[in-house]
Swiss-Prot record:
The keyword rRNA processing applies. HAMAP family: RNA_binding_AU_1 (MF_01910). It comes from Aeropyrum pernix (strain ATCC 700893 / DSM 11879 / JCM 9820 / NBRC 100138 / K1). Coiled coil: none annotated. This is Probable ribonuclease FAU-1. The lineage of its organism: Archaea, Thermoproteota, Thermoprotei, Desulfurococcales, Desulfurococcaceae. PANTHER family: PTHR39159, UPF0374 PROTEIN YGAC. InterPro entries: DUF402, FomD-like_sf, Ntdp-like, RNA-bd_FAU-1.
Amino acid sequence: MLYAVRVRGIYATALVALALKKGYLLSDLSKTMLSRVEVPVSTRPPNITVKHGEESRDEIVIHAFPYEAGERFEADLLEEVGHAAVRRSLLGLRSVVDARAAEGCRAEGPGGVLIIVKGGECPQPGSMVRVTVVRSPPGSDVVEGRVGVELTGLTVRVMHPGSGVRISRHLTSEDAAKALKAVEASGIDLNQFSVHIRSGARLASEGDISDEIRRLAREAERLWREGPGGEPAVLSRGEYLSLVYLPSTAKHVMDGLRTSLYPTVNNHHSLKSWSSEAEGLLTDFAEEGVREGLWGGEAGDLIVRFISSRLVGRTAVVLHRRPDGETIRLGPFRVSSYRPSSGRGGEIVLERTFRSPGVYDGLGLERRPGDRGVTHVYMGDWLTIHEYYDKSGRLLGVYANINTPPEVGFQGLKYLDLLVDVVKRPGEEPETIDQGELEKACRSGLLTDRLCEEAARQAERASGLLQSRYP
């Protein structure tokens, strides 16, 4: 089946290139995109919406119906970029499932997933209930459901039992009026069914919307009347939802895809992914020059070197992103030096003096006030080296963090932490730590296979590096 894709956000042009490469239809392109590239556009409502995340521009949101459309697009994206961290919903949004009720308005769903039952009275513990999943954030074990059957289509969602009509805020008044006529023409009883008009209704005829309402209402009524079965089960998979974190290496692949359709500087997506506007404005300016033939894509490398040099003498933070979605702000650090090299390379040195006591993670050593930390960040490399010294300048230990090649912005630096690390105390052998965390993330699919393999290689490399550099 050919699925139609709608793209939005900072990765939109690259995603158009990917969709064309992988054989998808394109639907509902923005005016900006239509002015930028000449591509065939389908008039169908989209099956898949792909955009950058609301909380992090380093992430891509994949929201799709049917469920398998999202699975396929995610697989195609990961095959292309290679390196990513992926968080998925435990159960598809608006999946219809049978669950066994437990105490406290909870129910055990398929696979032992715990569902919090919202709205109305709590079901009798031990009884079987048929619920629709209304909330299942990617990467979270919190799943919320509502008793009843809600089915998704491309233009509408229909709930039974339910009542009333809701309309997507993305529809114009004209499109909303068309959809309301379709609801009326469907002939369903709005005291028994609720209808939510989706944004995709804008691209459908009144007759198509009406037909989908009737079809979903019949199926929802059938599923509700037959009642729950004897064991937890999925009856309808609902909508696919996942968050794909793109580290710098994946963003470079996206740069290449974008270049195939539109003039693009190196590091385009890394620079655009920062929350401040400054990096994006520099990128836009550089790409004006590319379009006018004044310089090439390497102007993006110059931007990275410029930002890195501007950090010297200032304070900066390191955004230490973990695969599970947690971001730890390390610092603030004082940026003591920057040593540039060709392309995206170079070394940024960060320093800080500790004012409070504590323990150096991984090394198991006491940290005293007055101790000093020196961090070597190697642009384009997979290792970040932390050196720890006492007040007299004696080396206490070294910590090699395994992470994706860092990205630089005016705020500081960011990377995806790969969980495994290597530590070394003076006069001792290097020790690899947290290997189990990496293996768990790889088994669960949180990290892609290629990224897992790279993390293992880099941990081995770090061990040899620490042995030779810090005997």
